[in-house]
UniProtKB/Swiss-Prot annotation:
Single GO term (MF): translation initiation factor activity
Organism, as annotated: Homo sapiens
Residues recorded as bearing N6-acetyllysine in the entry: 264
Stated name of the protein: Eukaryotic translation initiation factor 3 subunit I
UniProt main location, coarse: cytoplasm
Family annotation (PROSITE patterns): WD_REPEATS_1, WD_REPEATS_2, WD_REPEATS_REGION
Modification type Phosphothreonine: residues: 219
GO BP: cytoplasmic translational initiation; formation of cytoplasmic translation initiation complex; translational initiation
InterPro entries assigned: eIF3i, WD40/YVTN_repeat-like_dom_sf, WD40_repeat_CS, WD40_repeat_dom_sf, WD40_rpt
Function comment: Component of the eukaryotic translation initiation factor 3 (eIF-3) complex, which is required for several steps in the initiation of protein synthesis. The eIF-3 complex associates with the 40S ribosome and facilitates the recruitment of eIF-1, eIF-1A, eIF-2:GTP:methionyl-tRNAi and eIF-5 to form the 43S pre-initiation complex (43S PIC). The eIF-3 complex stimulates mRNA recruitment to the 43S PIC and scanning of the mRNA for AUG recognition.
Cross-link for Glycyl lysine isopeptide (Lys-Gly) (interchain with G-Cter in ubiquitin), residue positions: 282
Subunit-structure text: Component of the eukaryotic translation initiation factor 3 (eIF-3) complex, which is composed of 13 subunits: EIF3A, EIF3B, EIF3C, EIF3D, EIF3E, EIF3F, EIF3G, EIF3H, EIF3I, EIF3J, EIF3K, EIF3L and EIF3M. The eIF-3 complex appears to include 3 stable modules: module A is composed of EIF3A, EIF3B, EIF3G and EIF3I; module B is composed of EIF3F, EIF3H, and EIF3M; and module C is composed of EIF3C, EIF3D, EIF3E, EIF3K and EIF3L. EIF3C of module C binds EIF3B of module A and EIF3H of module B, thereby linking the three modules. EIF3J is a labile subunit that binds to the eIF-3 complex via EIF3B.
Keyword GTP-binding on entry: no
């Protein structure tokens, strides 16, 4: 399995994301550049220039018309996907940690960090109302007083958002009223990543407590646990197999004191039902910060602390592989 290597960032990758069809791959890093690539051959299509700090999150809407990015320069920006033109600039008081379009692409949400004396907020904007964008006034703002949000996604049908916190808590906030619908605490440490399944019925969380866990999207009922010996930075569900891929590794500050072999910087594949590991893919030098499955399930990508993104197309053996219970 020879990967395609994407070199478009000078700093550590923070998030990678495919669009719905999977023909484009968006990558953001701890530099101000937002890149978009053809996923089939790794050719760089273009960049979205404008941010002045590390970019923490990226999302594309349903029909890949708009791209949304959130950055440590205290702004969330909306871009025209095709032309790279900046359509909106939403200023915040602290860094934007997570962002996302709802199912219809009309409503955006983003969460800000708890820093510099400012509270962590989740803001909701309706793109159909230009006055909200012009006046930088969201139609709803949810304060998070206890522990800041470290990852968030829209729930099924855009009725709620699912948010993971620094404390390991998982919340479901209503997108209509802003109230907390469900609250669970299955992780003991920070939740680094949340990714939904293709049909949005379940999602996987990746946590600093060395586990990834599977939950039901509507009830937040905990279903499966995937254990490793290292903090898990990202986890993604296969769209057509019962497989989950985990990416992680040591904290950046511990990395220099160990060899890469001890660091365990592989992408690890687990069976969804049996919670058993069945494969690993080496390659990155340093921890893996973000993983994503292609929507057709025939390839996956990973972005690492080394600043590289690798696109892996699965070998035929992967598709013939039968897991023996």
């Amino acid at each position: 399995m020879k990967p395609i290597l994407l070199q478009g960032h000078e700093r550590s990758i923070t998030q990678i994301k495919y669009n719905r069809e999977g023909d484009l791959l968006f990558t953001v890093a701890k530099d101000p550049i937002v890149n978009v690539w053809y996923s089939v051959n790794g050719e760089r299509l273009g960049t979205y220039m404008g941010h002045t700090g590390a970019v923490w999150c990226v999302d594309a809407d349903w029909d890949t018309k708009h791209v949304l990015t959130g950055s440590a320069d205290n702004s969330c920006r909306l871009w025209d996907c095709e032309t790279g033109k900046q359509l909106a600039l939403l200023k915040t008081n602290s860094a934007v940690r997570t962002c996302g379009f709802d199912f219809g692409g009309n409503i955006i949400m983003f969460s800000t960090d708890k820093q510099m004396g400012y509270q962590c907020f989740v803001s909701f904007f309706d793109l159909r109302d230009p006055s909200q964008i012009d006046n930088n006034e969201p139609y709803m703002k949810i304060p998070c007083n206890d522990s800041k949000i470290t990852s968030a996604v829209w729930g099924p049908l855009g009725e709620c958002i699912i948010a993971g916190h620094e404390s390991g808590e998982l919340n479901q906030y209503s997108a209509k009223s802003g109230e907390v619908l469900v609250n669970v605490k299955e992780h003991s440490r920070q939740i680094n990543d949340i990714q939904l399944s293709r049909d949005m019925t379940m999602f996987v969380t990746a946590s600093k407590d060395n586990t990834a866990k599977l939950f039901d999207s509507t009830t937040l009922e905990h279903q499966k646990t995937f254990r490793t010996e290292r903090p898990v930075n990202s986890a993604a569900l296969s769209p057509n197999y019962d497989h989950v891929v985990l990416g992680g590794g040591q904290e950046a500050m511990d990395v220099t004191t160990t060899s890469t072999r001890i660091g365990k910087f592989e992408a690890r594949f687990f069976h969804l039902a049996f919670e058993e590991e069945f494969g690993r893919v080496k390659g990155h030098f340093g921890p893996i910060n973000s993983v994503a499955f292609h929507p057709d399930g025939k390839s996956y990508s990973s972005g690492g602390e080394d600043g590289y993104v690798r696109i892996h197309y699965f070998d035929p053996q992967y598709f013939e592989f039968e897991f023996e219970a």
